[in-house]
């Protein structure tokens, strides 16, 4: 089995090392990741600057681009054989609810799907996570399960793991995305030269963390697995929209 591993925290992050080392026990693993932290890069691609790669001593490849760049260039140019699965992570921090739209971790998995490959994104739910090895073992089990149960062509799996020792994780729940309140306001301040600068405020508090959501599962000590679709169409609204838009 051949796997491509990437992330958005960067090629030097502890999460990608833990993930790659665990997966190497069952597969050939290529690691291609950003040369710096690219959190919240979403699905952005680099179109106005050239991409360069740097082959590190440990065999990993660093790219001066976004997570989506890394997966795209890895599949198209770097991997000597096409991988069978893309695994993104392990992210330092959860990617649940609305966060998935901003997440570079989820975006790397989505890029794998755009390139025709099944993919999963793995995140460790804590501000300063500790138990990367536990999350890596969960990822390993999911990858092994996917051998017998391949993903549909239009889906990825978004996996969020509570930051607990493996033996304290209660189990796995299949969930839907929860939701957050609006993000907190922008912070306006000045730099040392007196020039005005802005910092984006932190994400809003959880709005929907009810039973069945990713937020709810992780809060209870369970791994959350949410199947995400690439199709963003609001299918339930098509007829209602057509009824009035045709009269314009």
Swiss-Prot record:
Reactions it catalyzes: a ribonucleoside 5'-phosphate + H2O = a ribonucleoside + phosphate
Top EC class of this enzyme: hydrolase
Cofactor(s) this protein cannot do without: a divalent metal cation
Keyword Methyltransferase: no
Co-factor remark: Binds 1 divalent metal cation per subunit.
Main location, first listed in the record: cytoplasm
Keyword annotations of the record: Cytoplasm, Hydrolase, Metal-binding, Nucleotide-binding
Entry's family note: Belongs to the SurE nucleotidase family.
Protein name (database record): 5'-nucleotidase SurE
Organism: Shewanella amazonensis (strain ATCC BAA-1098 / SB2B)
Name of encoding gene: surE
């Amino acid at each position: 089995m051949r796997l491509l591993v990437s992330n958005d925290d960067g090629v030097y992050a502890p999460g990608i090392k833990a993930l790659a080392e665990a997966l190497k026990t069952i597969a050939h693993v290529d690691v291609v990741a950003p040369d710096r932290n690219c959190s919240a890069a979403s699905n952005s691609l680099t179109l106005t600057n050239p991409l360069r790669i740097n082959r590190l001593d440990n065999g990993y490849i660093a790219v001066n681009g976004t997570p989506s760049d890394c997966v795209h260039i890895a599949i198209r140019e770097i991997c000597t054989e096409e991988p069978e699965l893309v695994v993104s992570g392990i992210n330092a921090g959860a990617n649940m609810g609305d966060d998935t739209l901003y997440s570079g971790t989820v975006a790397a998995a989505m890029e794998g799907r755009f390139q025709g490959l099944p993919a999963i994104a793995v995140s460790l739910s804590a501000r300063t996570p500790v138990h990367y090895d536990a999350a890596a073992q969960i990822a390993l089990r999911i990858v092994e399960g996917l051998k017998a149960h391949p993903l549909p062509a239009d889906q990825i799996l978004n996996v969020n793991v509570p930051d607990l020792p493996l033996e304290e994780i209660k189990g796995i729940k299949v969930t839907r995305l929860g939701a957050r309140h609006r993000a907190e306001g922008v912070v306006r301040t000045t730099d040392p030269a007196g020039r005005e600068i802005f910092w984006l405020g932190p994400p809003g508090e959880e709005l929907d963390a009810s039973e069945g959501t990713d937020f709810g599962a992780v809060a209870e000590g369970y791994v959350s697995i949410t199947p995400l679709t690439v199709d963003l169409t609001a299918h339930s609204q098509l007829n209602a929209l057509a009824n009035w838009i045709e009269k314009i």
